[in-house]
């Protein structure tokens, strides 16, 4: 895994009186409402596929985060019911989904057909509970790549540390059989002596993690995210999946304007 340089420590020692302006909207962690953002960073993770070619990469994002409408490289979302401060907010969104790979992505998928990422259309409900938010969602493939859906619930809790905001989160998600079998199943024609044919059914996965948001000034901020996902057995038992335990660590620098 590629090592990621985290340079938060020195800044924290110097001290900072700025507020991080963190909030939850349409199931996402945002800062600086009503501004544009440009973000760059890197991530490292455990291998999802056995003998995966690489498990690190760049994190790039650019977009606008408004009061109701948000658009960036991760997708589009719009709050169509409720206002900031209301107990219930409802939204709709478009987002990229799936695990794109081909036979060059890992030794375990040599000779298999290419799997493509897709775009999902979804509905989201945010329920405010003090400094916490329960966020539920349902999304379905609209490009007919995997023909499946995902649904789940996450809990976010914003903790003001004075110099930074810490947002722990936890959730449970369900991936349909069509989704799981497209990405983690092995067709009869793809089976080999080392890779048996496999049908993946629908299953639950669980996640736990945090995001730390540290403002350098009113324009610049540093974020650091760590997350753990426990894959359901229908995914984990696939002959091409490396482990049920998946970790991800990332860090970014963002500029708001």
Swiss-Prot record:
Localization terms from the record: Cell outer membrane
Secretion signal, residue range per the UniProt entry: 1-19
Taxonomic superkingdom: Bacteria
One of the GO BP terms on file: peptidoglycan biosynthetic process
Cellular component, GO, one term: cell outer membrane
Keyword check for Signal: yes
UniProt keyword rRNA-binding, yes or no: no
Alphabetically ordered keywords of this record: Cell outer membrane, Membrane, Signal
One Pfam assignment: MipA
Predominant localisation class: membrane
Family, per entry: Belongs to the MipA/OmpV family.
PANTHER family with a match to the protein in the record: MLTA-INTERACTING PROTEIN-RELATED
Protein name per UniProt: Outer membrane protein OmpV
């Amino acid at each position: 895994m590629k090592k990621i340089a985290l340079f938060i420590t020195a800044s924290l020692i110097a001290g900072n009186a700025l507020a991080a302006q963190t909030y939850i909207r349409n199931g996402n962690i945002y800062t600086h409402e009503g501004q544009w953002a440009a973000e760059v960073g890197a991530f490292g993770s455990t291998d999802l596929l056995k003998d995966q070619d690489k498990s690190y990469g760049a994190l790039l994002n650019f977009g606008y985060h408004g009061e109701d409408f948000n658009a960036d490289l991760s997708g589009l979302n719009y709050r169509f019911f409720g206002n900031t401060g209301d107990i219930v907010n409802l939204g709709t969104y478009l987002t990229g989904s799936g695990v794109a790979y081909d036979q060059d992505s890992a030794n375990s998928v040599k000779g298999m057909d290419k799997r493509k990422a897709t775009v999902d259309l979804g509905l989201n409900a945010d329920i405010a509970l003090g400094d916490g938010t329960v966020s539920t969602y349902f999304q379905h493939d609209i490009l007919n790549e995997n023909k499946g859906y995902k649904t789940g619930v996450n809990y976010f809790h914003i903790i003001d540390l004075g110099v930074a905001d810490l947002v722990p989160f936890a959730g449970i998600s369900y991936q349909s059989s069509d989704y799981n079998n497209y990405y983690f199943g092995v067709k009869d024609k793809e089976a080999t002596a080392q890779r048996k044919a496999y049908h993946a059914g629908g299953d639950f996965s669980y996640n736990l993690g945090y995001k730390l948001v540290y403002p350098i000034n009113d324009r610049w901020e540093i974020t650091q995210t760590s997350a753990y996902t426990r894959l359901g057995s229908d995914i984990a038992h696939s002959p091409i999946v490396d482990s049920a335990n998946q970790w991800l660590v990332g860090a970014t620098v963002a500029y708001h304007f």
